[in-house]
Amino acid sequence: MSTDKRNQFLDAGDSEDDAGHGYDSEEDLQKGGRSAKRRRVDDDDSDAEDVSDQEEEHGEDGATNLREGTADSEAARDDEEIAEEGPKDDKADLPAELPGVSKPLAKKNLVASEAAIKKSGVVYLSRIPPFMKPAKLRSLLEPYGKINRIFLTPEDPTEHTRRVRNGGNKKRSFTEGWVEFVKKKDAKKVCDLLNAQTIGGKKSSWYHDDVWALKYLNGFKWHHLTEQISAENAERTSRIRAEVAKTTRENKEFVRNVERAKVINGIQSKAAAKRKKTDDSEEAAGSGEAVGKTEGESAQDKRRTFKQILLAKKRKHEEQPAHVLRVLSKIF
């Protein structure tokens, strides 16, 4: 009789581990867990399930196609209705797309009445940072008060041309300017805060290290500036007219002198030709030259001098005879 050498406790532990372990298809295939017949039956069942799944999918696809067809037809009808209503909607939305068409291009003058002129103040800028435009200046000073007008004096055109010719910056620069604030207290505040101070802002800014040079013009209004500019323009115009008149007079005098020189040269050439014709011999040529010279000079003098007509002399007061004087004395 054979003895059982296997440990029952160990066998029981193995069975519990197998029961607790989950299903793994890859391990069964490696170990040959199922027979060929079992696999064949499972394959047939899986094929049948695949066919049924395909039929269900075809059925669902047909239903979805029908739903999509109906949705497409409804979308087409909606598109036609939108196309019919489209022009009306575009016309209705046009004012909303262009909100600023009716606004005027020019800014309104805020200092028009006498009271507004009295309240306004003008600030003078003796130096404008290089290549700073009026829009940039307005953006820098606008936070300190409401600005009405700005005028900047442009640089000399010859200086700009020279700089561009030498390879410098082509931008326009300004030398000085005037800024009109709506309220004079804002103008005074700007001068007190910013005068002799750096412009500041971002360090990458072009004008970060430039210094403000502002001065409040007490009692100065904008119309004074326009009068000064008009006076300067009138003075420049009169100066240009005087220069043009002077140049024209000099040109006329030059042309007159040229014509006179031509006339004198023609007279002298004709006199020389006459002298050559009248010369028959060397002696006669010498005498002829002397005579021709005197004739030429006399002809030139005749051309240059004008004989004046003598005026009639006034009659001298004749003395009356003695008997006439005696008779006249008795009468008067």
UniProtKB/Swiss-Prot annotation:
Gene Ontology terms: cellular component: nucleolus
The keyword rRNA processing belongs to this UniProt entry's keyword annotation: yes
Residue ranges with Acidic residues bias: 43-59
Main localization, broad class: nucleus
SUPFAM superfamilies: RNA-binding domain, RBD
A matching Pfam family: RRM_1
Domain RRM: 121-211
Single GO molecular function: RNA binding
Protein name, as recorded: Pre-rRNA-processing protein ESF2
Provenance organism: Chaetomium globosum (strain ATCC 6205 / CBS 148.51 / DSM 1962 / NBRC 6347 / NRRL 1970)
Protein's gene: ESF2
